[in-house]
UniProtKB/Swiss-Prot annotation:
Source organism of the structure: Chlorobaculum parvum (strain DSM 263 / NCIMB 8327)
Xref: InterPro entries: Asp/Glu/hydantoin_racemase, Asp/Glu_race, Asp/Glu_racemase_AS_2, Glu_race
GO biological processes: cell wall organization; peptidoglycan biosynthetic process; regulation of cell shape
Full protein name: Glutamate racemase
Disulfide bonds: none
Free-text function comment from the UniProt entry: Provides the (R)-glutamate required for cell wall biosynthesis.
Main enzyme class: isomerase
Record keywords: Cell shape, Cell wall biogenesis/degradation, Isomerase, Peptidoglycan synthesis
Family of the protein in this entry: Belongs to the aspartate/glutamate racemases family.
Pfam families: Asp_Glu_race (PF01177)
Pathway info: Cell wall biogenesis; peptidoglycan biosynthesis
Amino acid sequence: MSQHKLSSCSPIGIFDSGIGGLTVLKAVQAALPSERLLYFGDTARVPYGTKSQVTIRKYAREDTELLMKHQPKLIIVACNTVSALALDVVEQTAGDILVIGVLKAGAELAAHRTKSGRIGVIGTQATIGSNAYSCAIREENDALEVTPKACPLFVPLAEEGFIDHPATRLVAEEYLSAFTGKEIDTLVLGCTHYPILRKVIESIAGPQITIIDSAEAVASKAKELLSKHGLLNQSSATTLPHLMVSDLPQKFRELYRLFMGTELPDVELVGM
């Protein structure tokens, strides 16, 4: 358990199973440009969404322990699978460090945005199987109707850089057909990899559907939480994020450039 003193100058730690958390990194950079950011993508063990709960909880503890070595003031769990099945492990491992999970932030935003009261959720097999999104949304309003759909192929498609590809469109059409006749007006991207494929998903879902990106929701939540605890970095300087991966740094570099639209800072290869 951490006992180090929280400082406004300490970094924000973000972790995900792979590149999906870059959607959170990008949103946090936009919302909090003065903050020092630390990112870990567990590219050696992606995807998490097909693993057992025991394995996911083990990975969550190890990922958190890695970030804790850098004494962060806040840890953002940029993985919906971990948020659904192992947020308590992260909180226990982090001790006195602030923790935010993307799942609750996305659920709250969806509950407040829907007008019809019918919400669709797409996510990994583990996230959807946990029923965590349905529970979190209904905690906000138990009258809301939630239709979940597991989309296990989206993560490998995003990891391979198939961002706007015929194969991705074909898979998306099959998955999103689950919402035909459900009359949803809101669709939660319940995995941080999915905003990478947002253009395809949005075009198939149609303009009448409000897309909820949990990355934007969690960035707003992070700003609110740091402000509440007096931990916002007041510096006007901006710094490059410190990036770490557990495998394939060159592939991560290529996908970072493709998605973020900027050159990649140095990437540190770490063993898990």
